[in-house]
Amino acid sequence: MKPALILASESPRRKQLLSEAGFSFDVVPVKVSEIPNKNLNVNDQILDIARRKASAALPLLKSSRQDAFIVLCADTEVIFNGAPLGKPADRQDAYRILKLLSGKYHEVITAVCLVESSTGKEVSQTETTKIYFRQLTDDEIWTYIDTGEPMDKAGAYGIQGQGGKFIERFDGPFYNVVGLPIDLVKNLLSKF
């Protein structure tokens, strides 16, 4: 019998993507510090946060479940000039981030970490998508900020929402930018 899949995330987008891909899973939200370890390179910083989520979820789940399970955790960051931008702290920060991205390339990196409860086996990997924003006007930026959409998203935009209109082109998986590269998840799950 295959172990149950547990999404350890508060992200409604990750839950939706897994559902739409046909996965059967439970959701257990976990909170961990998402402050990156600056001693690591950017890719490893993002992997480290996904692993911290798995480490926080495992003991919680083991105490409440008798069956074997695989915990799925992810972290997504928008990277500009080699540095993570994070989620905006406030409206002014959202403006700063969107102005920075306007007319330029950036990357979206998602780290996916899966851990099997009975063996402790972990598989993890990152996925990268390159994004090019068209030139944005101040009016467009403030109108978008007024929608509230950018406030809970890395890089201050959602490709699947109104923020998608700012993207001129992208190279890499679309769902990676939404927050969960489904093909990578399928590939990693096949290793169990």
Swiss-Prot record:
E.C. designation(s): 3.6.1.9
Reactions that this protein is recorded to catalyse: dTTP + H2O = dTMP + diphosphate + H(+); UTP + H2O = UMP + diphosphate + H(+)
Record-level Gene Ontology MF annotations: dTTP diphosphatase activity; UTP diphosphatase activity
EC category: hydrolase
Disulphide-bonded residues: none
Record-annotated active site: D75
Record InterPro entries: ITPase-like_fam, Maf-like
Pfam families: Maf
Protein name (database record): dTTP/UTP pyrophosphatase
Any GO BP annotation: nucleotide metabolic process
Main location (coarse class): cytoplasm
Record keywords: Cytoplasm, Hydrolase, Nucleotide metabolism
Protein family according to the UniProt entry: Belongs to the Maf family. YhdE subfamily.
Transmembrane segments: none
Annotated site residues (Important for substrate specificity) in this chain: R13, T76, Q160
HAMAP family given in the database record: Maf
Function field: Nucleoside triphosphate pyrophosphatase that hydrolyzes dTTP and UTP. May have a dual role in cell division arrest and in preventing the incorporation of modified nucleotides into cellular nucleic acids.
Cofactors, names only: a divalent metal cation
NCBIfam families: maf (TIGR00172)
Cellular component annotations (GO), alphabetically ordered: cytoplasm
Compartments, record wording: Cytoplasm
